Amino acid sequence: MEGYPLATEYASLSRKAREMILKIYHSLSLILSNNLNRKVSICLRIFGLVAVIYTVFWYGTMAYFKSVIQELRDNPTNLGFTASYEKIEITGFPVKFRITINNPQLQASLHKTKSQNNKEWIWRGKLAVVEIKPWNFNIFRINLSGLNKVSFINAETAYDFISKAKLIRIDAKISGSQIEELYFKANKLNISENFSGKEIFIDKALFNTQQVQQDSNSSSGIAENPSRIIRVKLKGILLPREFGKFLDSRLDKIFMDLKVSKNLRPVFNLNNLTTWRDAGGIIDIESFEGISGRLKIYGSGTLALDQKLQPLLAVAANFEGIMPLVDKLKLVGFINSRTALLAKFVLSGISRRSASGRKGVSLPLTIQDRRLSIGPAQLLTLPFINWGKGTLINRSKIDVN
């Protein structure tokens, strides 16, 4: 660029500037690269350490679960439980513990006294799968789909129930030694009693229970006597043919919302029920609904126990489609033609149209002194429940001939 000294000098300065910028960029790149590599290296080391610790924790917990289950099998607990199984396998790493137990069996005495040790229940399953998240051992899921057998045995009688289901799933949340929440779901559930041959089928069954806010002790501030809400939903129920005397053998649906006060323990024996009753325990039937063909029953009420620990029921019930029920009671000989005619006349006079447009009638449904009544009409006398001998009733008292 002779003849243009300024242009030559500018080009030289531009080249030097570019070289300087490249050197600065290269130096910064090395510094940043070293810092980034160091941070990545530290992160990888921390991640690797956490992974190793978690792996040790997971497999250590797996070994602990196996030892606890084996201990339960080899050494019966003080509660009288004995357990056995054919094979156990724990998988699910890293997100859960999936405990698969082949041919599990649990056996326990219904009573703790020595004179009543001959009364026991036995559960046998084909396969049980328990799933637990590593970060919360208080929440777990149990899958009992397939075949299950439950036997109640004592010196006088025995019951052998067999269930087959497409799905049986239980989700539970525990707090301390209590079940805070329990969710049960079953699909295509078939239950049969081996000795009587009676069989029940339920297309869908849902059961949910959870503790609600506890009552507070004003003097100590300690919470006590927790209440519990219970929700039951059953659909597509097929009853034994013997029950078709009064109702259709098929029940379309049963819905029920209950609130149990004063901490009723799940084991129904003489001591627990007496304590619950004396503490003022009642079951509030907040709502219920049952549909069988054209007959629909719904309402609310209360359930308690009398001095003999027999049920006391008081329900304000609404009936829709009750006339066919009167005809059926007459057909089976439960009421005569004159009584049926009088019942229809009275029911027609007090019936009102419901929100659905169907005619319905409101009548009290009660159980007192074991007598089940609808309005002024007594339907039947219920068998006496002897809680002192467990929850089982003599077979001859409950068979429907």
Stretch-by-stretch model annotation:
Residues 28, 32-70:
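N-terminal type II signal-anchor transmembrane helix
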Residues 188-254:
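Loop-centered beta-sheet repeat module
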Residues 247-255, 259-268, 293, 307-309, ...:
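Short helix-loop boundary/capping segments
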Residues 180-183, 227-231, 280-287:
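Short, hydrophobic/aromatic-rich segments at coil-to-beta transitions
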Residues 105-120, 148-161, 188-200, 236-249, ...:
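Flexible, membrane-facing loop/turn or short amphipathic-helix motifs
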Residues 78-218, 288:
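N-terminal beta-strand/beta-hairpin edge segment
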Residues 7, 14-17, 21-44, 86-87, ...:
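Extended terminal
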